């Protein structure tokens, strides 16, 4: 069986400081793994390398048996990420933020017309419902909602893509234990 993701001798330096050194890992289709380490150990950096946001100093990342740089847009669109720092746009509504994940996934030009597409709103609402977000916040500006709601909006934005590969960087850190367990069960 060919691995879905393969890391060969991945290293990363930042300002001459080694953040990652000679990481080797193979993940087969259907497998779920967790990266566990202390704060500052490089977990977020590794996820940033895996999804193409950062370039490793040394080594090779293969996804679908190809170096990341050789993936086509269709393959890259099958990769989603939930970030610990959320990366939401405060001036947009909850549903518009969720739709951003769908629009970026399809390499569409980011326009107000695309954000107001009815079918994408319906899909966004399904994802937000799945993450137990009440319909009363769909059209609310992010400045007016809680941290836990923002966390679930970020999760909704990632799952709207229907990714085959989902990287999650502390995706439940702003949630109460009940919601955390509910969402963990969705992903496991």
What positions do the PLM features span?
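ABC ATPase NBD coupling module
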Residues: 67-83, 117
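Catalytic Walker B motif of ABC-type/P-loop ATPase nucleotide-binding domains
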Residues: 166-169
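Helix-to-loop junction immediately C-terminal to a conserved catalytic motif
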Residues: 51
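Conserved catalytic motifs of ABC-family nucleotide-binding domains
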Residues: 162
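Conserved ABC ATPase signature
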Residues: 141-145, 149
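Conserved ABC ATPase "signature" region
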Residues: 115-137
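The feature captures the beta-strand-to-loop junction immediately N-terminal to the Walker
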Residues: 36-38
């Amino acid at each position: 069986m060919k691995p879905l993701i393969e890391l060969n001798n991945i290293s990363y330096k930042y300002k001459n400081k080694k953040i990652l050194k000679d990481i080797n890992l193979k993940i087969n289709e259907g497998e779920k793994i967790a990266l566990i380490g202390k704060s500052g150990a490089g977990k977020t950096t590794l996820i940033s390398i895996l999804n193409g946001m950062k370039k490793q100093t040394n080594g090779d990342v293969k996804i679908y048996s190809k170096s990341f740089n050789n993936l086509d847009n269709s393959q890259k669109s099958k990769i989603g990420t939930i970030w610990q720092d959320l990366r939401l746009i405060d001036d947009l509504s909850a549903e518009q933020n969720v739709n951003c994940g769908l629009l970026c996934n399809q390499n569409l030009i980011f326009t107000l017309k695309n954000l107001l597409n009815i079918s994408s709103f319906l899909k966004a609402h399904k994802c937000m419902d799945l993450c137990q977000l009440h319909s009363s916040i769909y059209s609310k500006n992010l400045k007016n909602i809680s941290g836990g709601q923002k966390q679930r909006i970020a999760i909704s934005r990632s799952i709207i893509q229907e990714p085959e590969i989902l990287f999650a960087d502390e995706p439940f850190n702003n949630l109460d234990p009940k919601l955390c367990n509910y969402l963990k069960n969705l992903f496991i």
